[in-house]
Amino acid sequence: VKLRRGWAAAQARPWNDQTVELASLRLERGGDRFIGACVGWLAERGVKRVLSPAMPDDQSSVWRRAGFENHLELVVYEKDLRQPPPPPLHRVAADPSPDPAALAVIDDRAFDPTWRIGKAGLVDAMAATPTSAVLTVRVDGVVAGFAIVGEMAAVSYLQRLAVDPDHARRGIGRSLVRASVDWARRHGARTMVLNTQPENLAAARLYEDEGFVRLGARLRVLAKEGA
């Protein structure tokens, strides 16, 4: 839903498809008072907690002035794209008309409830950059894993990667990473950036094995109780 007050504007959506009591709020323009008003509006509609987008600490001041506090933390990885990646281990294809609802089923199975983003979150990920693609690996004709990759100003973002647990440990995630790097290079990106949960050691090993370097900076999701 679009929230406006004069010049200020924000977008709000459910944090995921499992609960309406958690909401994600993305500020387009405005200050801490407007953020507070958005939290109040959401609380009146049953939202118990409002979460910010993931952001570095130097961009969080307006949220903290509105009463938001640290909630979740993400580590950031970066890869130089000058060298081509090894070939994927599976056939990876760009989906010309991805179905967010179908992808959300895989996403829900791949992540625990805290990190699920639901259909609306996947739509946001696809629209986060001017150029993007959904890459998929199919097993027996059914999508077993997907990646959402985008590019803007020569920087590529691996927005989301999920593999159905029934097909885990078969190299599908590795294939999607390599195909995402190849897509990014073909679309003019010079670096790729991604983030993941600090406790996701399997993902960390995969990314580091594929040439990603962990940066010192971390991203934080902030939260404020809505009611």
Language model regions located:
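A conserved beta-turn-beta hairpin within the catalytic core of GNAT-like acetyltransferases
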Residues: 9-25, 71-73, 150-159, 168
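A conserved beta-strand-loop-helix scaffold within acyl/acetyltransferase catalytic domains
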Residues: 12-15, 120-134, 138-140, 144-162
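Conserved acetyl-CoA-binding loop-helix of GNAT-fold acetyltransferases
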Residues: 29-40, 163, 169-182, 186, ...
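Acyl-donor-binding surface of acyltransferase catalytic domains
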Residues: 25-89, 218-222
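Conserved hydrophobic beta-strand within the GNAT/NAT acetyltransferase core sheet
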Residues: 50-53, 158, 192-196
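Helix-loop element at the rim of GNAT/NAT acetyltransferase active sites that forms part
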Residues: 105-117
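Conserved active-site alpha-helix within GNAT-family acetyltransferase domains
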Residues: 56-72, 170, 174, 186, ...
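A short beta-loop-alpha structural element at the N-terminal edge
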Residues: 90-103
